[in-house]
Amino acid sequence: MSTDKISVLLNWHATPYHLPIFVAQSKGFFAKEGIKVAILEPNDPSDVTELIGSGKADLGCKAMIHTLAGKARGFPIKSIGTLMDEPFTGVIYLEGSGITSDFRSLKGKRIGYVGEFGKIQIDELTKYYGMTSKDYTAVRCGMNVSKAIIEGTIDAGIGLENIQQVELEEWCKANNRPASDVKMLRIDELAELGCCCFCSILYIANEDWLKDHPKETAAFMRAVKAGADAMFADPRGSWAEYCKVKPAMNTPLNRIMFDRSFNYMSQDLINVSRDWNKVTNYSKRLGIVPEDFVSNYTNEFVQWEVAPEGGEAEGLAKQQEMKTLQAHVAEHGGVLQAVTA
């Protein structure tokens, strides 16, 4: 097996949900598998698919919709597994902004988004609510959606329930406002998708590198699976390990984000075919991929027993269960609630 380091480019700066990767490194799971790994963080998350697709990084993480779009644009990338499953994603706003649960209340508002596909999603939704893309102002915010809402440069922005929504809830608490002032219009519900899988965070690979390094790829997946297993077996100990190697993680905000991410984390790392079918069809609807596009994923390197996937009914039931779980964690705390700094 090659002793060269495998470069792994994250989809974002190190974030609580990246824990299995860093724990795999710090606990020696990569070394046990005979591989060396360099974990890299991007300056701009929009560059990740291009950097992996052009061979400047071997492996990495990216959302499902970006993985599909990157392949459609000619970058040879493929998903080899899942890090985080179906985090609730939507238009986040504050009570008093003039926005309500009616999508049409976004008319005349400034809506922030991370990358270009967020704007495409909102533009597409306007068609179903008697609006056009000219009825709102799109503002590209990159990693700073929450900050832009707080500063008032946007009225709402696309974000994740376990990341940007948490940032805003904690800001509200610090400013004598109830956390319930933070609201979300879930994109999957507005678009009638039946899942939030378009923002599932995947492990992706450069296809040329993948073809030449199947043993190293399998070793990487076994190691991050061991990292995930350690997290589920001992969340508090794993969080402490993560904070040891990434001291910036050791903040109250990050602990809450981890609590809110925990239920979304993939236990078996499988690419869920039901979700891929939905998001591939959704991407065709958005015009992100052509009609003859074939989903770019493989489960070849998930070499352990996995639970049956289930059909549409099981997927919808999972979403309802997750909604209940996340509401409980938001109100009562999660796996780290007793952990102190």
UniProtKB/Swiss-Prot annotation:
**InterPro entries from the entry?**
NMT1/THI5, SsuA/THI5
Catalysed reactions, semicolon-separated: N(6)-(pyridoxal phosphate)-L-lysyl-[4-amino-5-hydroxymethyl-2-methylpyrimidine phosphate synthase] + L-histidyl-[4-amino-5-hydroxymethyl-2-methylpyrimidine phosphate synthase] + 2 Fe(3+) + 4 H2O = L-lysyl-[4-amino-5-hydroxymethyl-2-methylpyrimidine phosphate synthase] + (2S)-2-amino-5-hydroxy-4-oxopentanoyl-[4-amino-5-hydroxymethyl-2-methylpyrimidine phosphate synthase] + 4-amino-2-methyl-5-(phosphooxymethyl)pyrimidine + 3-oxopropanoate + 2 Fe(2+) + 2 H(+)
Question: Which residues are listed for pyridoxal 5'-phosphate binding in this entry?
Answer: G115, E116, F117, G118
Give the active-site positions.
H66
This protein's source sits in the domain of life called Eukaryota
**EC primary class:** transferase
Keyword Iron belongs to the record: yes
Summary of subunit composition and partner proteins: Homodimer.
Put simply, this protein is called: 4-amino-5-hydroxymethyl-2-methylpyrimidine phosphate synthase
- Gene symbol here is PIG1
